[in-house]
Structures are given as structure tokens and as C-alpha cells.
């Protein structure tokens, strides 16, 4: 019991979600599928022109939280701030992408599969990608031309070692909408979430779609 109390205090003190008693620097990492191993995660950034490794890192976290630190190391090693980074979908983390863009780097990170909070009962024509965001008045317009508004309340989600804030958008028009059954099974109607790093993600998505041929070069 004393042993576990000591470990609990260590976790509380460091703020880490886990600790390894055999190798303090390692962590339980999802390797592939549902396979978890106590391990490290090695990162390497390669220059496209000369095919040389320009930065390396050994981490005890997965790819989702690795992009920005890798980019900073590349900037320091090359003494260059403006370049384009190509990364697979394992690096698709809104906060990491936002920080990377703010550092002056163009991001082309592969997209995750579309995850919709109301996926059950949502047909393709009513996926969240079919809703238009209106930056001028901070609203969304649905495929049926109804306006979804937010109360302005910021909610928080936690994942892995990070968290992010987001707002929820709804419209009372859902209650009488004749195609509601195609859009959502929620009794209250459709709900759209917009994260604090949404603009960075939208820019990355635009880059990915417009420069997909360039992204494919990382697979060569």
C-alpha cells in the first residue's frame, strides 16, 4: 500500500498521467491497433531536397503531441523559420498545428477520418463538413439554411496530455425541421462543436486538399 501511495504522490506532483516503476522515462504507448507497450517514441524530420535527417527526438508520448517540438528543433538546426512540414494523420492535433502555424510554418498534415458528435443517424449530406461557418457573426449555416448559434460558453475536453476549449452551436429550427431524421437522432436537435484552434485546422485542411500531390511526396 505504501508503495502505491508513493507512486500516487509522484503522479500528482509531476502532473503526468502515468509512471513506469522499471524505467522512469518510458511510458505505456499505443503501438498499433489495441497493442500497448512500455516504450519510447522516436521522431525524425527529413529535408526533402537533400534527403538528410535535420532533427531527431526521443519521446515518451505518442505522435499527437510531437509536431510542434519537432518543428522548433528543425528551425533551430537549419536557422530557418519559414518552410512546409508534411506529416501523417497521427500528428493531426489542433493545438500542435496551431502552434506550428504561429511559428511561421506551413502545415500539411493528413486528415483524420471525419468524427461527428452526432454520427449516429447522420447521413452523408448532413455531416459537419456540410455546415458553413460564418466568421463575421460566429454562426453556422446548416444544409437547410438554418442558423446555428452559440451561447458563447466555453467547454473543455481532455485528451492524452492536453486539453482544448470549444463552443457548441444549436438552432431551435431543428424541432420542426422535416429532415431532422437525416441529420441527427438527438431529441434536442443537431449540435456542432467548434474548437479554439478551428481556424488553424481549417487552414491545414485547405493546404492538404490543394497540395495533396506535395503531401504524397512524404510517402516516396
Question: Where are the language model's segments positioned?
Answer:
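Anion-binding and metal-coordination hotspots
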Residues: 1-220
